[in-house]
Amino acid sequence: MHLHKARSLLLWYGLVKPMIVKRAAAAQTTMKKTTDNSISRRLFITGSLAFTAMPALAQDGDIFSEQMIWRDPSIPVAGNVKGDLTIVEYSDFNCPYCRKVFPVMQKVVREDGNIRLVYKLWPIFGPASVYSAQLVLATRGQGKYVQAYDALMSSTSRVTEAGADKTLAAAGIDVSRAKQDLQKNKSEIETILKRHHAQADGFSFQGTPSFIIGKFRLFGAHDEEVFKQAIADARKMLKGG
C-alpha cells in the first residue's frame, strides 16, 4: 500500500470536526448511572480522543479516562511495558479479521520495540467467545494473560469452549486452575468485559478488530504500512507536532 493511501485511511478514521459522542452515555449506563458531567459530554477532536482536553471528566471511575483506556490496571500489557506509545486493541477470538491482523500487529510491535500493547477482549461472536474471553482473563492469576491470548488468537479455526480448554492446556496453562479462578472472580471478570463493551460502543466501533493508537482510532485489519503510519502520526500528536 502506498503512503498516500495510508494517509487517506488516517484521515478517514480521524473525525473532521468536534462532535459529542452521544452513544457513550448510553454505553455508560450499562455500568452506572451518569450525571451531567458524564461521558455524554466527552468530545472527539480532529481524529484524536480528547482525554487531555477535558480534565474535569477524566476522573477516577470514569471508564473513558486516559487511565482506564490506556492503563487499565486489570489488563496486563504485551510489548514494552515502558513504551512511549500505547496501542489498545478490542478483539474477539472468533473474529477472522482479528486472527488475520494478529501476526501483523505482533511484527509491528516487535520491530518498533517501544510500544505498550493492550489486548481488550470484546466477545461479540457468541457464547464460545464469551467463555474464551472469561477464561483468558482468569489466567491472570497465573501471570499468563498474554500467553493465553496469543494461543487462542493463533487458532486457525473457530474457537469452541472445549477447543479453548485444549488450546490453553497445550500452551502450558493450568486450565483447571483458570476455571476455578473464573468462578472465584466471575463478578470482576464480567465487569471488565462490560467495561470493554461500553468503551467500544462509546468510541462507535462497529466490530472487531478496532484499535486506539495513541489518541487515534483505527478500524479493521490493515497491513504493516498503515499501522506504522498510524503509529508515527500518533507519536507526532503526543509530542505536540
Regions found by a protein language model. Give the residues of each.
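N-terminal secretory signal peptides and thylakoid transit peptides that target proteins
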Residues: 32-51
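C-terminal cap of thioredoxin/glutaredoxin-like
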Residues: 39, 170-241
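Structural alpha/beta surface segment adjacent to cysteine/selenocysteine redox centers
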Residues: 86-171, 203-206, 237
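A short beta-strand-turn-helix
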Residues: 67-85
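Boundary at the C-terminal end of the N-terminal hydrophobic targeting segment
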Residues: 26, 56-60
